[in-house]
Amino acid sequence: MPTVVNYKDYIGAIQDFPIKGITYRDIQPLLANETVFRNSIKDMGNLIDKKPEYWIALESRGFLFASALSMIYGGGIRLIRKKGKLGNSQLVRVDYGLEYGKDSFEMANFPEKKGTKVVIVDDIYATGGTMQAAETLCKKVGYEVTDQLCLIDIGIVEQHEVKCLINY
């Protein structure tokens, strides 16, 4: 059962950051409140039907949410990092667009069984470029993405499959 919390009360808004025209959603107030953070994790987990074998954590704030989801719901964690931050020799890479630029993601290509069920986790859903890149990496490795999960949808893309706890 979802908790009754107005999570937007715990999200700050910083205008024109990181560039003019962008409103940065600051999750620090939510993270600073232990009860609200815990409830947000439980409510995020309740958005998906089946718990995965792995939570795929996107750099960097996705690490916070995927770790907490793993602790509450079980399952391991796999990291997707920005280019050049993983030391593994077996890496898969993809380039993608952001709402204000371009970047690259990398993921270790662990020898796992094909079709391992995963849920991709991040803090913010904006244009969908990050989630699409993460899904591409997961498929290259052989994972089956069962869900994509974010704390916040900032409302740029009207229709998408990503499950978000807070919608603007």
PLM region spans:
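Short, glycine/charge-rich flexible loops or terminal/linker lids adjacent to PRPP-binding catalytic cores
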Residues: 75-119
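Generic enzyme active-site microenvironment
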Residues: 57, 120-121
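Short glycine-rich phosphate-binding loop at a beta-alpha junction
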Residues: 51-59
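Conserved acidic residues
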Residues: 53, 116, 146
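Active-site-facing substrate-recognition patch
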Residues: 1-52, 110
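Acidic, divalent-metal-coordinating active-site segment for phosphoryl/phosphodiester hydrolysis
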Residues: 122-135
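PRPP-dependent phosphoribosyltransferase catalytic core
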Residues: 2, 9, 132-168
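Short Gly/Thr/Asp-enriched flexible loops that form oxyanion-binding sites at enzyme active sites
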Residues: 64-73, 135
